[in-house]
Amino acid sequence: RRERYKSQDELLGVVQKFRTLGVPIDGIIQDWQYWGNNYQWNAMEFLNTGFYDPQKMVNDVHGLNAHMIISIWNSFGPMTKQYKELEKINALFNFDTWPQSGSEKWPPRLDYPSGVRVYDPYNPAARDIYWDYLNKGIFSLGMDGWWMDSSEPDHFNPKPSDFDTKTYLGSFRKVCNAFPLMTVGGVSEHQRMQTSDKRIFILTRSAFAGQQRFGANTWSGDVVASWAALRNQISAGLNFSLSGIPYWNSDIGGFFLWNFKDPLKNADYRELHVRWMEFGAFCPMMRSHGEGAPRELYQFGEKGNPAYDAIEKYINLRYSLLPYIYATSWNVTSRQSSMMRALVMDFAHDKQALDINDEFMFGSSILVNPVTQPMYSKTEVKAGDSVKVEDFSIVKSKNVYLPKGNDWYDFWTGEKFNGGQTVKKEVPLDIIPLFVKAGTILPVGPKVQYATEKKWDNLEIRIYEGANGEFTLYEDENDNYNYEKGAYSTVQFSWNDKKKTLTIADRKGSFPGMINERRSNIVFVGKNKGTGNDAIEKFDKVVNDSGKKVVIGRK
């Protein structure tokens, strides 16, 4: 949520603050320089004195029911043990890379060159060395995932001769595009050989065809915060998904804040950050990160502040949708589906939908149309300076195209619309247009502080009438690979719109810790009924089932 934490106390304090505020959080990332100076670049050891007891740090994060992810790079400083081993087998490249300065302070001192060199991930022996140190220095502590930065890799001042560099598989010119595949794959394959008890999680800045098999989520890089950048993230994510790699996200709020003076007090940036957060809630991964200002929601005020409340609202909404998101993720794994879907993937028959690049489907049922322009900030002159201030006096609207061939429900109001038309939706700061396809069966999970806090034994099941529909609820042990051996369960929900019946089929499969009984709280969505993320006071039907088929009538 900020560029990096300077100590383990600072990192742990953030997780504790979220728990105190009652705002959900599942993971925190430690970025670079926990290894100390740049001559020890990527040492895969906690040489920075601010991280005085890394085992305790990891244990404390886990004790707060959160996961910890850490930055690792594809290059090594000359004082690291890895550098010396890799140099012996000619598995280091000679071209310029990041960082160029030996000093970790900013701005860089180029008269003190770092000597950092990129390793050769095409070489299986180099990949073995890489994992050996990563395993002993960090994974053994119980680390939960990897932020693989600079996975292109960074290549500064490129010269034609750089591409003649010999790799294990030939010239760098020949294989450079596959660099991220090889380095990400090396970590993924080694971790999987090490254990099947912890699912692989890798966040990587770059990707290549086939990388989806390595448990990798790619982010869009260190983008500069602006409204144009936010708009561009939508089409970037959709094109990435169309390439066959389903897990993608961006630095919520933008990484660099060069365009904003005093950003946390700048109304324009605060609005941008909120809108980016709203978009991020409907990306395959929801993650905030950047330099120039810390990004935790409490940096934007406190409860009752419009920005704080909007951010909290969408974090909670993301968690409420976890049963839907987890089932969608299962479809990615089992049916080669995707999470963030360009309209052409579901509405190829609708010519008007083909050229739309600012809205998308999140899974098969939810249409998302992010707000990507400023609406609630204005310029005032104070003490001779022009400053941006908030102005919520007029609620603005946004046009939304609803693809034809389906009816659609406004997620926030329950109002029903015909497809094949453009509608105007009011978008106060805490609302982006969300529409749910008729025929959808949408499970809504419990309010939680972390993903696995509560079992899904008391789900709200929203029925969006107007078409037949199906949804398969998927559950497993959450953090191992036993599902590959069949340790999971599915329950199919089917809505027959003509007969007005909901069928909950026999549960299939089982796994350790599976619940035996579930309460399904059914609501038939209508105007101001079964809407938004608000608690439902009265359900239309309540069904208790023990895994056996149940048929429920509308009346």
Label each PLM-derived region with a short phrase:
Residues R1-I431, V436-K437:
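Catalytic-domain carbohydrate-binding cleft regions of carbohydrate-active enzymes
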Residues Y409-L429, G530-K555:
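Solvent-exposed beta-strand/loop surfaces of large extracellular or lumenal domains
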Residues I431-K548:
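Accessory, solvent-exposed terminal regions and/or long lumenal/extracellular loops of proteins
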